[in-house]
């Protein structure tokens, strides 16, 4: 973590995001254009992961390593992206866009900064991890920049509820799949050893509390500028109506 190779990967990801931001603006990407591009990267990413993470089955043949099942928060966003791409317009789709924009940005950046697959240049999953999360970050920022996402107080509350529901869901999933040592959403143990804040030095429950608090604080700080802007807009509109 934060080695020379890691900084190279971070630089590649930042460059990719900047290039895609510029290209999307220059070509005036529609939401559908951006969705199709992201889904293409998702397809490549999942294909790479499946090809790399197949393991021998007990009774012959092979199966996907249960640790690679799509229950991490960034992997769950694959399904949300599919609905955004192919689903009907409406309140549900808008809620998914709102959730995706925030969690995708935070999750993508966190995954780039904490490389759980390592940073080696000769491992396929490393390429898959960095490029997927770089694209995820770009797409999430695209949703915000081009005003497809609406981020206010009510959206903050909705996103908090959904995130907590996913936390509870993965507490169950990690328990069901405990024999396979899964760690979805990193609520079993830290994503990497030796992290300064996310560690088990003070016991599991302190660690879990810190994970939850980081999620709540991160979500709150992300929404804060939009909530302030929304409130100012409401006050301005109210003053105008009075006048």
Regions picked out by a protein language model, each given a short descriptive name:
Residues 7-15, 70-80, 100, 113, ...:
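Membrane-embedded alpha-helical segments of multi-pass membrane proteins
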Residues 22-35, 86-96, 146-157, 232:
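Membrane-interface helix-boundary motifs at transmembrane edges
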Residues 1-12, 154-165, 177-219:
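Membrane-interface transmembrane-helix boundary segments in multi-pass integral membrane proteins
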Residues 83-144:
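Membrane-proximal helix-loop-helix units in multi-pass membrane proteins
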Residues 16-22, 80-83, 135-154:
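Alpha-helical transmembrane segments in multipass membrane proteins, preferentially the mid-helix core
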Residues 41-51, 104-115, 163-172:
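Aromatic-anchored segments of alpha-helical transmembrane domains
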Residues 58-71, 121-131:
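Non-cytosolic membrane-interface motifs at loop->transmembrane helix junctions
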Residues 23-24, 47-59, 112-121:
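Juxtamembrane "helix-exit" motif on the non-cytosolic side of transmembrane helices
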